[in-house]
Amino acid sequence: MKLKKIFAAAFAFCAMFAVTAVMPQTAGAEPYTYTNKEEGYSIMCPTKPLGVLPASVLNEDEKGSVLVFANDGYKINKAWIIIPDGFDKGDLPDLTKLSQKDEALLLTQLKENSAYAVVDIIPITAKTKGVFAVTAKTIMVDTDGDGELDTEATADTQMAVVFLRSEKGRAFKIELIDNPEITAKNVSEFRAGISTLKDL
């Protein structure tokens, strides 16, 4: 059954880019509201996606959607990955209910115990907050399997990610793919889009 799902996802990926594989593609310039009735949310995008793929195309264990805005052949250059129920609520408290002191303490803990290069707690809407993070460009890895991080490696890409609770309390993980480098413009659009996330 798992192989069937993987083959189906791969077919969807190939079919979506079958026409666009030769030339680099970028989505149109008009804002667009993406609605996912099955997952129960909508979000405003800076442009209409070229296509939408299942998140399992990139990670077979994740259930969600990949909104692709730009690609070069089969390489995704810009996309949002939206994962409803994307984290355990027990791992992240309701940020709107924390005192300033507890929020600062949580932020310190997140910075000390995560592999992200940037971590911050940001307002999403007037009623919600989220954790914004950017993956590290250089990371330490265990090359000999002894459990010790011994070698510095350079990641091919960086990603931005936001963990948030919607106004109905759903746990969303939303990621930005931005190749070859993360840009301020795309991060700004990403954060603006996240602020429009609505439960259906």
Where are these regions (language model features)?
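Positively charged n-region of N-terminal signal peptides that target proteins for export
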Residues: 1-5
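Sec-dependent signal peptide hydrophobic core
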Residues: 7-15
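C-terminal segment of classical bacterial N-terminal signal peptides
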Residues: 16-26
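Short N-terminal segments immediately surrounding and downstream of signal-peptide cleavage
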Residues: 24-46
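Soluble non-cytosolic domains of exported or imported proteins
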Residues: 40, 97-100, 181-188
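Surface-exposed amphipathic alpha-helical segments
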Residues: 49-51, 167-200
